[in-house]
Amino acid sequence: MIELSSDPYVLKTRNTPLTEADFRIHLNINWCRGVLFNVVAMKNSIAVVEYDAILWSEDSIMFIEYKDSPAAYKDLSSRRVQQMNSFAKNIARGLGFKSFNFVVVVKGLEESTSKGGVMVMPLVELGSYQPNFVSSITELEYLDKMIAKYTRAGEAQFALDLEKLRKIFEIEQA
């Protein structure tokens, strides 16, 4: 079993359920450099979340939760999806990835939707899915919110100064 560590998280692989065979067949791995299936994320030796797949490239990482039926998906609460998204962001940042994506994939789902602010897609769309990565760096997100706020308020010069600060921060992160 593979184990990756980045304080305070440890990622460990687990056994693969047979119900995930369809999921693996539909998974698009053309864009990534590596994949781990069935990963348990532990924080301080306590399992906090499981992901059915983690895919990564040079600077981005994607976390996937798979449900093998719409009924199993309905049992997944919005709060839990938000927690899984938050853990994904923290793990991505801890492992040094600049951007991340978390998505829920459901076998038998009719159309894409969202739950807890996270994209939920049918399994049949997974093969053509191009991840929409977002920043794992909280400070950049906050700067984006401030830029939008001051742009709406008509404070164009201040928004431009914040944009310069954002670019400086991005260069230092590179």
PLM feature spans:
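Intrinsically disordered, low-complexity Ser/Thr/Pro/Gly-rich regulatory segments
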Residues: 1-174
